[in-house]
Amino acid sequence: MPRGGATGAELQTHHTFSFANYYDPRRVHFGALRVLNDDTVAPGEGFGTHPHDNMEIVSIALEGALRHGDSMGNMKVLRPGEIQVMSAGTGITHSEMNASETEPVKFLQIWVLTDAQNHTPRYNQVELAPAKRNVPHVIVAPEGRGGEHVGWVHQDAWFYTLDLDKDRVVEYRMNTRGHGAYVFVIEGSVEAAGEELGPRDGMGITGADEFPIKGETDAKAVSYTHLTL
């Protein structure tokens, strides 16, 4: 199913779920997964200061450098191999700008519904540990369930990356029985639970506590698991 979004000289954005001017009643959320935006920002451009509240916001850098500034006083640059996690809670403002004047920045921004209203706002930037190929690699976990190189959110939600070799099959297991998973392919092609997915394709999977993911080519994917609402 085609994604929503917009294309211009400053920004190319693709929305998996309803966002901004894109609305599809069939694609509002998957469990607590509310937004999955795939953004490419031109050199020197970006998103000026804007507000958020009561949302867990995860940013994953794919290429280039993303400069972040917020009302809590954080000024950081996010690069590939790092993730950024914000709890908007009672309210924050922030900006996201391409830190380069010559190269575009590409990143995923993912919003997760919070487990409770009005948490204290916070910002965390994490350098990810090296990932083994053909093994799901946790990058975000619920509070207290991760580690030094894992971000955390106020929600029973998990994020993994998976670097998969061609023809390799990995059994993907839910963290908790009854959870669902959303698989989003960054590069290459996979077969997930019997369905073929190409670059930037995504699919929600429910009703199974585990399912196979096969590399149709060498591939890179990100997955999300949470109780399906």
Model region roles, listed by residue range:
Residues 57-97, 104:
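Hydrophobic alpha-helical segments and helix pairs
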Residues 68-69, 86, 93-101, 171-173, ...:
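Short beta-strand His + acidic residue motifs that chelate non-heme Fe in jelly-roll/DSBH
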Residues 55-69, 82, 175-193:
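Glycine- and acidic-residue-biased ligand/ion/polar-headgroup-sensing regions
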Residues 148-204:
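Hydrophobic secondary-structure block in the mid-to-C-terminal portion of proteins
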Residues 225-229:
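Conserved small/polar residues in nucleotide/adenosyl-binding loops
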Residues 85-132:
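Hydrophobic, well-structured mid-protein blocks that either form specific transmembrane helices
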Residues 5-51, 55-56, 105-107, 129-173:
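A short glycine-rich, His/Asp/Glu-containing loop-to-beta-strand
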Residues 72-85, 194-211:
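Short acidic-glycine-tyrosine-enriched beta hairpin
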